[in-house]
């Protein structure tokens, strides 16, 4: 009897056993690495596709409050047409206003419903506390307490930017929708992160 394969999990496992990444580094020494890096970066940018057109940030600080040793702000800006980015910005109370301090962009990951909040040390829900305890997830808050300005953007599909699809993973839905248009969610999130830099420079 012929071998038959029905499982997509097994399919991907078998396909990857002999897979060699196209742009893996196979050289030796600094010169070879620099040439590989240039080629790999060009390929990465090609695969990411075009970034959106920038629009005026139209940034607003919706609130600014003292939170222990920190100043906690909610900022919203526009990163492109049809896309606004809510952020939490944390900075030490005694941070000089001369922009001499380093800033760190602190991004969230899964679970999608929590978004940026636990990264910024928000503890308004039991799930926030659980994520912070389990993953040491309030790293944006910790870095601000260590003297940095930190900004936590809400990445697309997470937290406030998460459309509810029931039990279906929003990342999958957004990937499929974007792929049809030749737009990738990762590219859009990188764009929003770049726009955080633009905001910090204002």
Regions found by a protein language model. Give the residues of each.
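N-terminal targeting or regulatory segments adjacent to alpha/beta-hydrolase or S9 domains
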Residues: 1-71, 79
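Basic side chains
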Residues: 15-18, 37, 74, 91, ...
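Solvent-exposed, flexible loop/coil residues
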Residues: 29, 94, 185
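Alpha-helical packing segments of well-folded alpha/beta enzyme cores
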Residues: 36, 40, 44, 83, ...
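Short alpha-helical scaffold segments that flank and stabilize functional sites
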Residues: 40-43, 90, 147, 199
């Amino acid at each position: 009897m012929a071998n038959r394969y029905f499982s997509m999990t097994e399919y991907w496992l078998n396909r990857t056993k002999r897979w060699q990444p196209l742009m893996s580094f196979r050289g030796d020494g600094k010169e070879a690495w620099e040439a590989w890096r240039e080629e790999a970066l060009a390929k990465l940018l090609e695969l990411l596709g075009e970034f959106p057109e920038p629009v005026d940030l139209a940034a607003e600080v919706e609130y600014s409050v003292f939170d222990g040793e920190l100043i906690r702000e909610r900022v919203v800006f526009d990163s492109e047409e049809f896309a606004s980015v809510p952020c939490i910005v944390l900075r030490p109370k005694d941070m000089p206003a001369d922009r001499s301090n380093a800033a760190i962009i602190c991004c969230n990951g899964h679970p999608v419903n929590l978004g940026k909040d636990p990264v910024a040390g928000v503890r308004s829900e039991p799930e926030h506390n659980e994520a912070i305890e389990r993953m040491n997830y309030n790293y944006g808050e910790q870095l601000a307490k260590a003297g940095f300005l930190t900004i936590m953007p809400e990445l697309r599909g997470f937290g406030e930017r998460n459309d509810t699809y029931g039990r279906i993973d929003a990342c999958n839905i957004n990937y499929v929708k974007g792929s049809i248009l030749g737009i990738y969610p990762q590219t859009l999130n990188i764009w929003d992160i770049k726009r955080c830099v633009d905001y910090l420079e204002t």
